[in-house]
């Protein structure tokens, strides 16, 4: 019975047969010629022209000029016809030049490859400024119309990027790299992806674990760009703590930036304006905010001296001297002590003494009203939202909007326990690229809204937010859900409370449908 047809190195077709099957004479002759042509002991026969030249060179004595001409002829013929590997299409040559430009610019080639695929699939993208500028030179309509999946140049570029990334991984497979990959793994311009190795011995919990995409908000090239911007702002005397607070409020609540900070950002090439047609994840401010948070978190305080109490005002000093003076009437002493207590108490506290909570720490500088109210409610179980808001907002007209935002955020928070899960091992795969801050303190994954993420942080609910929704029983799939962006669900809830819009695609996102987009990361 005939077996499987195939072709040998010399393009002779051969056929597998069973032992009891007869072989015709014609097939015997063809198989003999095929085996002789494929035999490793005998090289393939030379062309007739080459054989003729060899016979002529071995013939009777030739003149020196004739012999030199014959010996040089094969070299001229070979040089005139380049091998197949050297004959590249114009698009392939241009793709090679693009890769070289990206390498010289310090771009993350793996991120460019992933983002190029996203552009061609009409998905969310996150290019660094260097990557974007280089690609716009060759794809000038990329920002307006994207890149067609039928583009010959784009497909050649994807293939060349894939080959280069594979070569880089092979070259970087040093013991130090292997040690780093075994401990966990390695998420991205000022827009925040990186390459890493899958931990040996880890098993995937689903068939989709091998085809996932993530956004890395601080690759090496982008970190250098962000650090340069931060250095210039520091030299200009910008208050970085104030800048972080203002950026956080702008990202979370769209509160306008102070004019001086807006001008400072524009002077270093960052346009803080957020147009309506640009999703949050695509805005350059996000990656800059992540870099700013990392810089400030890395600063360590060097002073251990206790803070000196503030100097008392002249009026307060006078009252204290009066209390130490010769005996006063009891009514006078009580009036002075009450007056001193009122002076020491902040005005907002005096106005809200009737609704003051049992536990009420001061509001942090970088904490908006919604976040502060949620923290107070957690510290005062059973306290009504309206009472919590009234405890620190003195203007009754401004309270209702904050109350509405808090209730919207509180509706989203309980959904965390109902989300579908992705294991930490799968999240740390090459395609997703999650890096826990506890395992990678110098290269941790940053939340979409700034701070670094860790499953061991009790104040965070780490999730991956997908671009496309799927019903709850289905596991994560890169083909269906597309890109996955890591963030703290508590921060996302605060953002959605003010603006119920998906930060990746601007679709509506609220407590009713968040379970279709979000995946909980579990140890």
Swiss-Prot record:
Main location: secreted
Pfam families from the UniProt entry: AvrPtoB-E3_ubiq (PF09046), AvrPtoB_bdg (PF16847)
Residue ranges with Low complexity bias: 181-194
Keyword tRNA processing recorded: no
GO CC terms of this entry: extracellular region
Localization in the cell: Secreted
Biased composition (Basic and acidic residues): 18-31
One GO process term, biological-process aspect: symbiont-mediated perturbation of host programmed cell death
Disordered: annotated span: 1-94, 165-223, 299-320
CDD domains: HopAB_BID, HopAB_PID
Keywords assigned: Hypersensitive response elicitation, Plasmid, Secreted, Virulence
Upregulation: Transcriptionally induced by HrpL.
Role this protein plays: Effector protein that plays different roles depending on the species and plant cultivars that interact with the pathogen. Acts as a virulence determinant by enhancing the development of disease symptoms and bacterial growth. Acts as an avirulence factor by eliciting hypersensitive response (HR) and plant resistance.
Family affiliation: Belongs to the HopAB family.
Protein's UniProt name: Effector protein hopAB1
Species of provenance: Pseudomonas savastanoi pv. glycinea
